Regions:
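Active-site-proximal alpha-helix that buttresses catalytic centers in soluble enzyme cores
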Residues: 1-177
Length: 177
């Protein structure tokens, strides 16, 4: 059976260890997609685009593909879950590097990448619906935006959160003028 590999952009562990919600948010997205698909295929969430010598969130997409192919699992579909359009991390990193390495290990062209959303009319309509619902709510941002990562010490992060949360007062002031 085909194994689905959801590939998302990785984060340095220093960011993850401060409590950044991104890994949980990506995992929740993967779970929602799997629910929609009826859990018909086995799957894994893996991470790509690590740079530099520091520790990053793993397992790496390239390592996951190599290890599965070496174990005989050659039918893989890579799903760039955190990439909504084609760019260097899909067209080069996945298509050229990861899939090429898999074929060198004997995958025989059976490792594929799901098409990115790009200009899909369904995707664009979905974004428009989300934007409209947000605008109709009158809220400047989601409540989640105001919650700092538990270990965050970045003043820039704090100031951006204060800015977005302060937009409600500015919006209310503008409405009452």
């Amino acid at each position: 059976s085909v194994v689905l590999l959801y590939s998302a952009h990785s984060l340095p562990m220093s960011v993850v260890n401060r409590g950044d919600p991104y890994p949980a948010e990506v995992a929740a997205t993967v779970w929602a997609v799997q629910q929609r698909l009826g859990h018909k295929n086995p799957y894994r969430l893996c991470w790509q685009s690590q740079v530099g010598p520091s520790a990053w969130l793993g397992a790496q997409t390239s390592d996951t593909v190599k290890n599965l192919v070496k174990k005989g699992q050659k039918d893989l579909v890579l799903i760039p879950i955190s990439f909504t359009s084609d760019h260097i991390e899909t067209l080069f990193e996945i298509d050229q590097e990861v899939i090429h390495e898999a074929n060198e290990l004997g995958a025989d062209g059976r490792v594929k990448r799901a098409e990115s959303l790009n200009g899909s009319t369904v995707f664009i309509q979905g974004l428009a619906d989300i934007a409209k619902a947000h605008l109709d709510s009158g809220e400047p941002c989601s409540r989640q935006m105001g919650l700092r990562c538990p270990g965050c010490t970045s003043e820039r992060c704090l100031e951006s959160k204060k800015f977005f949360l302060g937009q409600k007062e500015r919006t209310n002031d503008a409405v009452t003028l």
